[in-house]
């Protein structure tokens, strides 16, 4: 599925993959609910990460592509 994820796609964050990640152990694990309950748009990408914009007044966030799933 990660091969289908591209710039401009709408995605959701997979809670289990984010909460059990190395990045989660290095930061506050009280993730805001909008990460899991709303769609995010990919605004930029590199090899392993995607920059997500959520339609809430929050900063964009970089997450690993394997922590995302496409919204259909």
Swiss-Prot record:
Enzyme Commission number: 7.1.1.-
Reaction(s) this enzyme catalyzes, per UniProt: a plastoquinone + NADH + (n+1) H(+)(in) = a plastoquinol + NAD(+) + n H(+)(out); a plastoquinone + NADPH + (n+1) H(+)(in) = a plastoquinol + NADP(+) + n H(+)(out)
Alphabetized UniProt keyword annotations: Membrane, NAD, NADP, Plastoquinone, Quinone, Thylakoid, Translocase, Transport
Topology term for the membrane: Peripheral membrane protein
GO molecular function terms listed in the Swiss-Prot or TrEMBL record: oxidoreductase activity, acting on NAD(P)H, quinone or similar compound as acceptor; quinone binding
Compartmental location: Cellular thylakoid membrane
Gene Ontology cellular component annotations, sorted alphabetically: plasma membrane-derived thylakoid membrane
InterPro entries linked to this entry: NdhO
Stated family: Belongs to the complex I NdhO subunit family.
Annotated function: NDH-1 shuttles electrons from an unknown electron donor, via FMN and iron-sulfur (Fe-S) centers, to quinones in the respiratory and/or the photosynthetic chain. The immediate electron acceptor for the enzyme in this species is believed to be plastoquinone. Couples the redox reaction to proton translocation, and thus conserves the redox energy in a proton gradient. Cyanobacterial NDH-1 also plays a role in inorganic carbon-concentration.
Protein's name in the database: NAD(P)H-quinone oxidoreductase subunit O
Lineage: Bacteria, Bacillati, Cyanobacteriota, Cyanophyceae, Oscillatoriophycideae
Gene that this sequence comes from: ndhO
